[in-house]
Amino acid sequence: MEFTIDNTKVFSVDTGEKFNEKNPSVILLHGSGQSHVVWSLTTQFLSGENYNVFTLDLPGHGNSEGASLKSIEDMALWLNKVIEHLGIKQLSIVAHSQGCLIALEYANKFPKNLQKIVFVAGSYEIPVNKSLIDLALSGDMESLNLMMKWGYEKSKQFIGGNPLQKILNSPREVREVLAVDLIACNNYKNGLNAVKKIT
């Protein structure tokens, strides 16, 4: 499914099911440098359980157009525009890593629509190693390997290799997508206040 927010194309996985107001709605938010691809199995499962599932690509990520947004606050405002455009009145958000920060800030600014937040490998703040940011800013593809190495235990093996290398294919994408995301995560400082407001 494609639609337009702020004159820019937004992509969400089309599950083949029509929106049903009687069914619960869930938005899946990916992490830094990622896309809807990381939620493929989750999207299928939730759709099969009769959820209205919206698996979004953030601006500049995956199949969504535009530049990557530079702050978590801007991403939360964008998310609200998406939710309003889709006509969702009540929803849950399942979020991974950076997506958790976006979900927190959304809950802080727009609590009335939100029923639940599920964190997957998330926290109220995500400080990022300066060396990783510098590597990503330089467009070095090694930043993808380091991100996976620091994020997972040594014994963890990925079938088909590092999933980030399947999403980010060039030094330009590393600079313009991953680096921007990492800086946004590192700069976000409102998480603790947002957590305290969740009831």
Regions found by a protein language model. Name each.
Residues 1-9:
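N-terminal cap/lid segment of alpha/beta-hydrolase-fold proteins
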Residues 8-65:
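Conserved HGGG/HGGXW glycine-rich cap/lid loop of the alpha/beta-hydrolase fold
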Residues 22, 87-90, 112, 199:
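Active-site acidic short loop of glycosyltransferases
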Residues 30-32, 91, 95-97:
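Conserved alpha/beta-hydrolase "nucleophile elbow" surrounding the catalytic nucleophile
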Residues 57, 92, 115-118:
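Residue in the alpha/beta-hydrolase core beta-strand immediately N-terminal to the catalytic nucleophile
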Residues 74-91:
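Conserved acidic catalytic loop of the alpha/beta-hydrolase fold
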Residues 101-144:
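Flexible "cap/lid" loop of the alpha/beta hydrolase fold
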Residues 134-197:
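Conserved alpha/beta-hydrolase catalytic His-Asp/Glu region
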